[in-house]
Amino acid sequence: MDPFDAGAGGLLKQPKSVWATAGASVVAFMGIGLVDPILPSIAQGLNATASQVSLLFTSYFLITAVAMLVTGFVSSRIGGKKTLLLGLAFVVVFAGLAGTSGSVGELVGFRAGWGLGNALFVSTALAVIVGAAAGGSAAAILLYESALGLGMACGPLLGALLGNASWRYPFFGTAFLMAVGFLCITVFLKEQPKPARKTSLLDPLKALGHGGLASVAVSAFFYNYTFFTVLAFTPFVLNMTPYKSGAVFFAWGVLLAVFSVIVAPRLQKRFGSLKVLGGSLVLLAADVLVLGYGSHTTAVVCTILSGAFIGVNNTVYTELALGVSDAPRPVASAGYNFVRWFAAAAAPFFAPKIEEWTDIHIPFVVAAVTAVAGAAVVVVRRKALTHEAEELEPKHATEDGVTVFAN
C-alpha cells in the first residue's frame, strides 16, 4: 500500500495518539538543531571557544548513545507511555536549566541530561508510532521521518527567532513546548502493552553480532560524522547572525524533510535502497568538500543542499537497520543507534579541533572521507545487506505491534 494513499490506511489518517506522539517528536528533534543559529552567540555570551561550545552537541549525543542500551530495558518494564513521559520530563527540566546556565560547563552538563531525556523519548516514540499507526510500518516510518524533518527545519528557526533577543530564550522555549507535549501524551496516548519478553541491557550489543546489522551501523557511523560536521561546525564557518543562520538551516531542514518523506521512497523503488544510499553518500561527500573550499555564498548553498542527501540517507538507513537482521526491531534499532550516535558526539568535538590544528578546510575534507567510507561499507557488504533484508522482511512484518515497544 502506498503510505500516501488517502484511504483508511493513509499517512494522514492516524489516531490522536499517533499525532500526539508525532507532534512531541517534532519538538524533540527541534532540540537537536535549536542551538545551531545561536552557537556563535553562546560562545560570545559565555566567553567560550568554538570547540568548547561544540561540546553542547558532544555531551548531548554521547549520553544519547549510551542511553540507547537503557531505553529498551526501561520501556519493556514500565511500558511505552511511561517511558515517553519520563523522557519528556527530563527534557523539560534540563532544557529549562540550560537556559539558566552561567558557564559553558553548566550548559554542557544540562545538555547531557537533555540528551538522556531525548534518547528515552525519541527511541520509544518510533516504536509507539510503528505500533499504533494506520498503514503499517512503511507509513509509520515515513510519519516518523516527517517529524524528524519538520523538527530539524523548525529547530534552527525557533533558535533564531528566540535567540536573537538572548541565547537563553530558545532553551526556555523548548522546555515550554515539551511541557505541552507531555500534556498531549498524557491525555491522548493510552497505556501501551508491554512486550512479552523484557529487554536486557546487553540485547542491543548482542544484536550487533549480526553481520548485516553491524555493517549498517558502521556505515551509519561514518555517515553521521559527516552529518554532524555540517550541523555543528558549519555555523562557525558561515559566521552569520542568528536570523540568517536560522534561515539557512530552516531551508536545509525543509530539504531534509522533503527528501526523507517524498523523494527517498521513490528513488528506492526505482533504483533500490543500496544504490540510492551509496550514490547519496558520494554526492554528500562532494557537497561538503565544495562547502569547505568554496566562497561564502557557495558554502551557504552547499549547506542547504546537504539537507537533500541527508534526508535520503536517513530514510534508507532507518529501513535497513530495522529490517536487515533477525533481531526484534526495537533491539536492532537500539544497537544501531548506539553505534551511530558516537559519531554524532565525535564530529562536533573533532571538527573545530582539526581546524585549530590545521586550517578551516580540513574538517570538511575529513567529513568527505567519512562519507565515502560509509559508501564503501555499503558496497563491500551489499550482498549480505540485500539478501538478508529480503529474507527477513516477512518475519519483521509480524513484529509490527506490541512487540516493538521495547525500543
Residue ranges of each PLM-predicted region?
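Helix-to-loop junctions at the C-terminal end of transmembrane segments
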Residues: 68-79, 259-272, 355
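C-terminal transmembrane helical hairpin of 12-TM major facilitator-type secondary transporters
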Residues: 274-317
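Conserved MFS/SLC helix-loop-helix module at the cytosolic interface between two early adjacent transmembrane helices
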Residues: 65-102
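Cytoplasmic helix-loop-helix junction between adjacent transmembrane helices
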Residues: 110-150
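C-terminal membrane-cytosol helix-exit motif in multi-pass small-molecule transporters
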Residues: 175-194, 377-382
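A late C-terminal transmembrane helix in Major Facilitator Superfamily
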Residues: 324-360
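Helix-loop-helix hairpin linking two adjacent transmembrane segments in secondary transporters
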Residues: 135, 142-186
